[in-house]
Amino acid sequence: MTEATQAQPAVPRLTSLSHGGGCGCKIAPGVLSELLKRATPPALFPDLLVGTETSDDAAVYRLNDEQAIVATTDFFMPIVDDPFDFGRIAATNALSDVYAMGGKPILALALVGMPINVLPHETIAAVLRGGESVCADAGIPVAGGHSIDSVEPIYGLAAIGVVHPSRVKRNAAARAGDVLVLGKPLGVGVLSAALKKNQLDADGYAQMVATTTKLNRPGAELAALPGVHALTDVTGFGLLGHTLELARGAQLTARVHYASLPWLAGVETFVADGVFTGASGRNWAAYGTDIRLADGLPPVAQALLTDPQTSGGLLVACVPEAVDDVLACFRADGFDRAAVIGEMADGPARVDVA
């Protein structure tokens, strides 16, 4: 064979180079909680409005009476094999934490770890372009970053945003009687597991990418609505984990209505066939003692409710009178599956699902 006709080495699948993918590769919540016990007490910094104390989505630091900085970082290993899509998903997921605090992103820095001698440079460049495309859609620059030669592919962003100090929305401020509204359908982790097992068809892949690359832009507008008390996004700890954070922060019981939950197409069938992530079980092991699942729920309920979401939806706690405005805010930005999924009530800090 001539040099021109020699077979070129196959480019490995991105997902084959990592032991986990997306937010499913987070450190288990119980382990993370133990590690963070040694964090510096936030009381030493009076302008630090939000730190690590309630496992909120981002740090918030007050600059003056009119402006605060929202700072967050998020990165993970590939959840898909297409490098451009991987970059888009990772960037969308990172920016979500700014929106979840009620903030508006202004700047991002890229965080890149790649097996530089394994992946073609054009593959790595496509990941970066994917992230830049999302940031351009959000109206912000990728102004720099940091890179290392890594055994497993890693990509994400450090994101900076701004918010008025009075409009910061924490995950610990829900009140009894608040209604819970979820912005995106659930099941991303299940679809990613199906993809890794070569069981996800083109339509399933398309819906997974569509939901994970949709910016949670309504966050800032939601934060400005009267009657919106708390805001977070549903990511690696699953719907139950992030709802439990709301419950613990407010010392209330969160009630979730299973029949009202929006699901991505096909996820219930996949779980029934045994296709779901290992992170689902780790999530349940970490917080299952504070969950009450009613009798009569489908056998797949536990795995679905703990399914790790990558770039998941915003979860809003608001007064009943604000629900129509919250849903209108979501739908004006194309979140057609936004739904009322439960409410907060007096009671022990736990989640009840019925």
UniProtKB/Swiss-Prot annotation:
GO MF annotations, alphabetized: ATP binding; magnesium ion binding; selenide, water dikinase activity
Cofactor remark: Binds 1 Mg(2+) ion per monomer.
Catalytic reactions on record: hydrogenselenide + ATP + H2O = selenophosphate + AMP + phosphate + 2 H(+)
Similarity annotation: Belongs to the selenophosphate synthase 1 family. Class I subfamily.
Keywords: ATP-binding, Kinase, Magnesium, Metal-binding, Nucleotide-binding, Selenium, Transferase
Binding-site residues, Mg(2+): D57, D97, D233
UniProt GO BP: selenocysteine biosynthetic process
Enzyme Commission identifier(s): 2.7.9.3
Site positions (Important for catalytic activity): K26
Function comment: Synthesizes selenophosphate from selenide and ATP.
Origin: domain of life: Bacteria
Name of this protein: Selenide, water dikinase
Quaternary structure and partners: Homodimer.
Alphabetical list of InterPro entries matching this protein: PurM-like_C_dom (IPR010918), PurM-like_C_sf (IPR036676), PurM-like_N (IPR016188), PurM-like_N_sf (IPR036921), SelD_I (IPR023061), SPS/SelD (IPR004536)
Keyword field contains Nucleotide-binding: yes
One Gene Ontology CC term in the entry: cytoplasm
Names of required cofactors: Mg(2+)
Pfam families: AIRS, AIRS_C
UniProt keyword Metal-binding present: yes
Binding site for ATP: K26, T54, S55, D56, D74, D97, G145, H146, S147
Active site per UniProt: C23
